């Protein structure tokens, strides 16, 4: 994994948080797809809309999860890339991290597509090495931070 991605996890969070504020639900999931250099290629969020791919995967109510939304927003010519990283964020209404591990329906296809999957926990982040058995996970010890400390509730950076 790129050191640039690891050192910029909180920067990516500041990109995800304003998008999370737009979601009316209490559980605000945001997914970013990055290339191996750490450039953001696509951003997705949980959507109440339906999609044929969601039905194929077997999501309840055929509703699109953030991981699938980010993949669908990715240019079709790029979807076969093997060095992509999935970053999953979940925030509560106070801007705190919550567990955003891909669900049982998302995990098999995510581990097949993404080289690494990084998701938030209450204590920071966890990394799953993709493109293999998803039970092998590596905990990344990065202290949790509250988005309110770096962003105002209006979604604009405070410093």
Please annotate each region the language model reported.
Residues 1-159:
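Zinc-dependent deaminase catalytic domain
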């Amino acid at each position: 994994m790129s050191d640039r991605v690891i050192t910029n996890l909180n920067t990516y969070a500041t990109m995800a948080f304003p998008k999370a504020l737009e979601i009316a639900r209490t559980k605000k999931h945001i997914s970013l797809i990055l290339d191996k250099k750490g450039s953001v290629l696509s951003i997705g969020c949980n959507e109440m809309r339906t999609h044929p791919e969601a039905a194929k995967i077997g999501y309840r109510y055929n509703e699109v999860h953030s991981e699938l939304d980010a993949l669908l927003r990715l240019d079709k010519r790029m979807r076969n890339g093997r060095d992509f990283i999935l970053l999953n964020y979940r925030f509560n209404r106070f801007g705190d991290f919550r567990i955003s591990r891909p669900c049982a329906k998302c995990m098999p296809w995510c581990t097949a597509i993404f080289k690494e999957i990084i998701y938030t926990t209450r204590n920071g982040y966890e990394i799953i090495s993709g493109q293999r058995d998803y039970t092998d996970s590596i905990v990344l010890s990065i202290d949790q931070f509250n988005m309110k400390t770096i962003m105002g509730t209006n979604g604009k950076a405070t410093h």
